[in-house]
Each structure stands twice: as structure tokens, then as C-alpha cells.
Regions:
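Short, solvent-exposed loop/turn and secondary-structure capping segments
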Residues: 126-127, 287-292, 341
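Divalent metal-coordination and catalytic microenvironments
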Residues: 92, 217, 277, 330, ...
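Active-site-proximal beta-strand/loop segments in catalytic clefts of secreted hydrolases
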Residues: 94, 106-107, 116-118, 127, ...
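N-terminal prosegments of processed precursors
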Residues: 21-130, 254-258, 381
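The catalytic-center signature of Zn2+-dependent metalloproteases
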Residues: 232-255, 301-374, 378
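N-terminal signal peptide c-region/cleavage motif recognized by signal peptidases
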Residues: 16-18
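Bacterial N-terminal signal peptides that target proteins for export
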Residues: 1-8
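Fold-level signature of zinc-dependent metallopeptidase catalytic domains
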Residues: 21-42, 135-303, 316-319
Length: 382
């Protein structure tokens, strides 16, 4: 892989998330029936310092689920800063299914997250943060998430149409020397940043919102790339008028990425990490003014003091925001877009996570995994 590739290469993922209900719909979803969480207080009284393993059981989609969960220590440092310590990230698997992985955040007794059962990805979404707009916690297959044609496209071209394809696309692009399992053998520290616009949307829950998204990203990367995501730092800027504030009022995605890179370069608490990722509440746009852009990142930029940066919009729901972030972090890891002319993965035609348009897949293609494996092998911070 070229040693200078990261200097100028960046890639943008785009889709219209400003009015998510208009761009994503579900052909089927169900509430969680007979939900029980044992080993932790469902009223949120369990504290981070004493959090232990839990079992989560429920019925849905014609089957019974038994989730075996342990606190996700990679994210607990960030979680300790949350008010009341009632937000706990968990990782684990389905009982008796070693090819599965689970990432769940339990906030005030309410679960949300992702389940990979060995063949398909399932999303659990809480009231107020689910695609269906339901007033209860729901579960659905990502394959049942329908994306409006043309609403999720990238400047590099291409469009995809369902949620299952987004995961498949991501995994296909990351997937060679890795196994579908809950564990990971290496790790990378990712510094998380939120701008004032993100804080304006999520308010006091901004850190919780970032934590939930990164817990899902960790599931994807741990299982498919063999690299776990550690989060030693979450910085939430709440006032754009208070100095020092690193971002201008620009909504141009490339310009905002440059500002993030400058901030990372000059901030020791960020550049000590392998990567920095910004969640923005802005409706960012491309150089041509296309506001369907939702993410951008430097490609092949692991461990780079300035260029180890990427950003994604945090204006949608947790599941799809996490897929966007995973896509952009995939670029940081060296994965180009699948099926794009003159790309190293130009011949990849499936619906995978690194397709130029969000499609509901969380799977990296084999080509993506091969490309990332090269960068991982050379990365000093992994």
C-alpha cells in the first residue's frame, strides 16, 4: 500500500438523513416480548464500577433470544463520565452460538444495539430512537430496512437499497483474515469528538449517544477485522462561541474534515490515539452542494498524527449512524469504496459496507478486508 496514499485520499459516504423517516422504512418490525434482564438492575441502579455479566432474554421474530453479556471494558472509561453511571455498554453472544456477536447498551434499564446471529444482523432500538417511530423497544432485521432510491448515495457514484446490504457491504470490504466471532486479538484507541450542533440535538445525552454508536462499531470491527475499538476519550463541545472551539460554521464536508485534522494534530489528548472521529450535528454537503453527504474520512490514515481523522453525521438513529461511522473508519483502515472505478476494490460488485452508498449492510467485502489487513500490519498504534 502506498506510503503517501493517506496524504490526499479521502472518501465521502452520502445519504439524506435529515428526514430519516422519509429515507428509511421497515417492511417488518416487532416489539420485544417478555423482556427480562437478570444480573443487573433494570431500573439503572447498577453502577459502572460494579457492573458484571448479565443475561437478557426476550421473544421476537418467531424465536426466543438469550443474550449472554459482559460489560464492554473498552468503552467503560468513557461510560464512567456519564451522569449517574446508568448507561452501561455490553458485549457478548447468543447462548450456544459461538459464531454470533452482540453489542448492547442498557440505559436506565432500556436496551438497544446490534445482534449478529451468524447469518443476519438484527437491530434493537429504543423508544424515541427507532426507525419505526414506535413508542416501545423494537427489533428488526437490517434486511427489512428499505432505503429510498437515491437518498443514500456517494459522490463516487452508486446506490443501494436495503439495510442488510449495508452490513454485507461493510463486512465484505473488511473480511479476509478475520472470523465472525465476538472476540478480537488487537486493539486501537479512538478519540471521539462531538461538535456543538451534535450537542444541540442530543443535549445531556450526547455522550450516551456517542457511546451507543461506538459500541456497535466495536462489534463490527472486533468480529470482522479482529481489531477492538477502545474509547479513552469523548469530547463534547457544547458552545461554538466559547474559545477554543476548533470548528467554523462550514457545512462543507471536506473543509470540516480539514478542521478536524488540524484539531487532532494540535491536541495531544487526541493525536495520542490511533484515530479521531467526529460526530457532527450539521447537515454537511459535498463540494457541489449536495447535502446527501453524511460522512468523510482520510483513507489509509491509521496512526497519522494529523490525518488519522474521519467524521460522520449524528443526526439520524443510532443503528444507521453507527453504520456510517463504521464505513468512514473503514476508510481510515485503508478500505476504498467497493465497485468504484480505479479503486483497488473496483471489481467488487456485492452490496457491502464499503459500497459508496449506504445500503443497510454491515459486512465488509473480502477486498476491503484484504486492503485493511495491509494497513493494520503496518500500523504502529494497533
Amino acid at each position: 500500500m502506498s506510503g503517501v496514499r493517506w496524504l490526499a485520499a479521502w472518501a465521502a459516504l452520502s445519504f439524506s438523513m435529515a428526514v430519516q423517516a422519509a429515507t428509511i422504512s421497515l417492511s417488518h418490525h416487532e416489539p420485544l416480548q417478555r423482556l427480562s434482564i437478570s444480573g443487573a438492575s433494570v431500573d439503572g441502579s447498577q453502577k459502572i464500577g460494579v457492573a458484571g455479566p448479565v443475561e437478557m432474554n426476550f421473544d421476537a421474530l418467531g424465536r426466543s433470544f438469550e443474550l449472554q453479556l459482559s460489560p464492554n471494558g473498552r468503552l467503560l472509561d468513557a461510560a464512567r463520565d456519564l451522569a449517574g453511571n446508568s448507561v452501561i455498554p455490553y458485549r457478548g453472544k447468543l447462548a450456544g452460538n459461538d459464531s454470533s456477536w452482540v453489542r448492547i447498551v442498557i440505559a436506565d434499564g432500556v436496551p438497544s444495539g446490534l445482534i449478529w446471529d451468524g447469518s443476519e444482523l438484527l437491530a434493537i432500538e429504543r423508544p424515541g430512537d427507532n426507525v419505526a417511530g414506535a413508542d416501545s423497544t423494537i427489533i428488526y432485521r437490517l434486511a427489512d430496512a428499505i432505503i429510498a432510491p437515491g437518498s443514500m448515495s456517494c459522490g463516487a457514484g452508486g446506490s443501494l437499497s436495503n439495510g442488510g446490504a449495508v452490513y454485507k457491504s461493510l463486512v465484505s470490504e473488511l473480511n479476509a483474515a478475520t472470523a465472525q466471532a465476538e472476540g478480537a486479538v488487537t486493539q486501537i484507541d479512538v478519540g471521539a469528538v462531538a461538535d456543538a450542533e451534535f450537542a444541540g440535538i442530543h443535549g445531556a445525552n450526547s455522550q450516551q449517544a456517542i457511546l451507543a454508536r461506538l459500541n456497535n462499531v466495536d462489534g463490527i470491527f472486533s468480529a470482522q477485522v479482529g481489531v477492538q475499538i477502545n474509547v479513552p476519550l469523548v469530547q463534547v463541545f457544547t458552545d461554538s462561541g466559547a474559545a477554543p472551539y476548533p470548528f467554523s460554521g462550514t457545512v462543507n464536508a471536506g473543509n470540516l474534515l480539514d478542521e478536524l485534522a488540524d484539531y487532532r494534530n494540535g491536541e495531544p489528548n487526541q493525536n495520542v490515539n490511533g484515530l479521531t472521529h467526529l460526530w457532527t450535528g450539521k447537515d454537511v454537503e459535498s463540494d457541489t452542494g449536495n447535502n446527501s453527504t453524511v460522512g468523510i474520512a482520510f483513507t489509509g490514515a491509521l496512526c497519522r498524527q494529523r490525518f488519522g481523522a474521519g467524521l460522520s453525521e449524528g443526526r439520524g438513529n443510532t443503528t444507521f449512524d453507527a453504520l456510517v461511522a463504521a464505513h468512514e473508519i473503514g476508510h481510515n483502515f485503508g478500505a476504498p469504496h467497493d465497485g468504484t472505478s480505479n479503486s483497488a476494490c473496483e471489481s467488487e460488485t456485492g452490496d457491502f459496507l464499503m459500497a459508496p452508498s449506504l445500503n443497510g449492510s454491515d459486512q465488509f467485502s473480502q477486498c476491503s478486508l484484504d486492503q485493511m489487513a495491509d494497513d493494520i500490519a503496518q500500523a504502529s498504534c494497533i
